[in-house]
Design a protein with these regions (language model features):
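Glycine-rich helix-loop "coupling/hinge" segments at transmembrane-helix boundaries
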Residues: 41, 113, 118-153, 172
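Hydrophobic alpha-helical segments of membrane proteins
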Residues: 30, 34-38, 100, 104-112, ...
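Cytoplasmic-entry segments and transmembrane alpha-helices of multi-pass inner-membrane transporters
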Residues: 2-36, 65-68
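Generic hydrophobic transmembrane alpha-helix motif, especially the helices
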Residues: 24-55
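Membrane-helix interface segments
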Residues: 9-17, 46-47, 103, 142
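Short amphipathic alpha-helical coupling elements at transmembrane boundaries
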Residues: 18-28, 68-83, 94, 135-139, ...
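Membrane-cytosol interface at the C-terminal ends of specific transmembrane alpha-helices
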Residues: 45-96, 102-114, 162
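C-terminal transmembrane helix and the adjacent membrane-cytosol boundary/short C-terminal tail
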Residues: 106-109, 147-172
Length: 172
């Protein structure tokens, strides 16, 4: 929904457009690592602040990228649906979303890939997860476990990349 309201051509009101854009800018203004530190100080150590930071920043980026995808959809397709008497919601459902779907999917898959890597970094600040295990292995000089963790991260990223290619080939 934030992407729809942050797109100039689908936002129902200019004030709402600017408010949502500013909220998305705030969410993206700081990297996940900084938001994780903020959330660690608010809720303590563990995986929750890392998840909160990823959700916060991801929402900001997805909202912006999806709004930009919506803003560049083919005007002729949208006008064709509007010419049938379709309202705002029907225009979104039958023109804007189908035209923007390939960009949406590409963006979501990229963000998913990015978040897997970002989750590793968040462990450095005590936000839990595989990043924490990576740091502990380094601190304890447990290089066998360190190599295993790096290999696991590589395998997950590779699987996500292949999954992304399959999805893109079916949709785009």
């Amino acid at each position: 929904p934030l992407g729809v309201f942050a797109a100039r051509n689908t936002s129902p009101h200019l004030v709402l457009y600017h408010c949502i854009r500013n909220v998305l800018n705030l969410m993206r203004a700081l990297p996940e690592l900084v938001w994780a530190l903020v959330f660690v100080s608010a809720v303590g150590l563990g995986p929750l602040p890392g998840v909160m930071a990823l959700i916060f920043v991801t929402t900001g980026f997805l909202g912006k990228f999806l709004a930009e995808s919506i803003e560049v959809v083919d005007v002729n397709g949208v006008m064709g649906v509007k010419s049938t008497g379709a309202g705002w919601l029907q225009t979104l459902t039958f023109a804007v979303f189908p035209l923007a779907l390939p960009d949406f999917i590409g963006t979501v898959l990229y963000i998913l890939d990015h978040n897997v890597r970002a989750a590793t970094i968040l462990g450095l600040v005590g936000a839990g997860g595989i990043g924490y295990e990576l740091v502990m292995s380094m601190r304890l000089f447990n290089y066998g476990r360190l190599i295993l963790i790096v290999a696991a991260i590589y395998i997950v990223v590779t699987i996500l990349d292949r999954f992304s290619n399959v999805i893109r080939s079916r949709v785009i």
